[in-house]
Amino acid sequence: MASLTAGTVLTIEEIEINGASDYVHGGNVDSPREGPAPGSYGLTIEGWVLSRQIPIEHVEVLYQERPLAVVPVERARPDIAAGFPGIEGADRSGFLATISTLKLPPAFELVLRTKLVDGTRLPVARLRGRRRRLPAGGGEEIQPLMLNTIGRSGSTLLVTLLSSHPDVVAFSPFIKDARVSTYWANVLQDLAEPASYLAPFDPPDLERPHWWLDGGVGELGEDEVERWLGSDSIELLSAHCRAQIEAFYANLAGPEGARFFVEKYLPYQVIPDLLAEMYPGAREVILVRDFRDMLCSVIAFNRKRGWSDFGYTEGGDDAKYVREVMHPSLARLAERLRGEGTRPYLIRYEDLVLGPEPALAGLFDHLGLAADEKLVAEAVKRTREETASMDHHRTTSDPVASIGRWHDDLPGEIAAVCDEELGPLLAEFGYEAL
């Protein structure tokens, strides 16, 4: 198995090809090969796939079922035409996809999947690899406190409690749901795409908006220049994006300063892993709430506002929502909790509501922050004062009434679906099933 040696940016450790099936004559990944890839955070995947009868719509490059690239199958492949004489489409059965590996954690697994025009999806290949971690700052700067959670779990309450500590800063959590670090991390990820950093050398149309994001993906003919653009230049850009995050929160904290800034993140995002590379002192907190109460809150909050959010549609299939929206997100949270990368700390909404002082003191202590009784009591008191008038954010008369509401609000058949689909996850996070 290939290893990530000093100076190597990216290595492919294993490639699995699915080969022929009832639907396709075959397929392959020609590039990259197993072993060290060209010295760049950009990854180019080139190959071919040939359908037997049903035409191919496109090839998808997926990470954890989320598409990173969707490309047509139309590149000239005279070699495949020669190997499959008389087979329609063999001469143009090639595909080419480019992605930034900064949209992946340092160790990753990609799935290549083809979609036929009738909607059938078939795996083509699986790639496992690793990339170099981004250079980190010195650690003296303000560090991210990453709250990883799902909507209607009490995240705004927790952000307010955390930012009541003198060493933690957040931007007006009950007014704006600020995502400053996500913004700059996304800027970094998008500009680290080969289609972006190669765009200045073959711009398709300078009059087209955002041409710098999806320009050319051809080769420059200057290997060293292309290597620098895809590695050293990306690391310089990473430092710039990190500096922008730090500058915003340093300005927000004022002359007193702060050790942490706190923002929310979603389970599917790679951003917490990326920030953990950029910041040596990054910490992660996972917030959960009884999933059944959370579902009740999502439904009630959407009805209260009169529009759909959190992936839930009024009048939709609640069982399908539990299976296809809630389960994947909660499973990802569980995966993060088991991981060791950011040493995540688990906190439950119910503990914040029923015993905020001990829950908050334990969290502050875990973060290495002052956690004396007076400071914690003042943080809880300040939060209660700030949230007293936030009725528009609530769906019950008070937070205590929101605990266990599912016993009355959730139809029995949906509660049973939650038990069936989410039972092991409920137990893992410390909740009892039916």
Model-derived features: where do they sit?
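PAPS-dependent sulfotransferases, especially Golgi type II membrane carbohydrate sulfotransferases
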Residues: 1-17, 112, 133-146, 299-303, ...
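A conserved segment at the C-terminal end of the G1
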Residues: 156-168
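PAPS-dependent sulfotransferase catalytic domain
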Residues: 227-230, 236, 241, 249-375, ...
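ATP-binding Walker
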Residues: 152-153
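Basic, ligand-binding patches in group-transfer machinery
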Residues: 2-136
